[in-house]
Amino acid sequence: MAVGKGDGSSSNNGNDRGRGGYVDPRFKRLLWYLIASTRGGINRARILELVNSHPANANKIAQELKLDYKTIIHHLEVLSKNGLVITDNEDTYATYFLTPLMEKNYDSFVEILVKFGKK
């Protein structure tokens, strides 16, 4: 087994590297669980893609994805509790953004979508 160089690199041809370097395998498992292994994962993936392209409030997300507002709120709560999205405030019109951790690991998210057959 090869040992990394201490700079976040590893011996698996870069498969564990995100935008910002090393990808924590626990975070990757969390993404797999939330996107590929649970009911509602497709909608969570769609929300993450939308918020990555342009942060928005829950109402705007519901309109753009053509989903019920309460469904969006549920998925945003799941994503928020798991550290994937964050809001600028707790207001009704709060804008949702990807967390720095999710931004750093966005490539892993895309990889999961490709393997899951959704990209």
Predicted features, each with a name:
Residues 17-45:
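Short alpha-helical segments that sit at the start of domains
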Residues 30-31, 95-119:
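Conserved segment of winged-helix/HTH DNA-binding domains
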Residues 42, 53-57:
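Short capping segments at the starts of secondary-structure elements
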Residues 45-51:
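Hydrophobic residues on short alpha-helical segments
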Residues 60-64:
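A short acidic, leucine-rich amphipathic alpha-helix
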Residues 67-78:
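Short amphipathic alpha-helical interaction segments
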Residues 83:
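Glycine-centered, phosphate/nucleic-acid-interacting loop/turn motifs that mediate DNA/RNA or nucleotide
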Residues 89-95:
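Short, Lys/Arg-rich nucleic-acid/phosphate-binding segment
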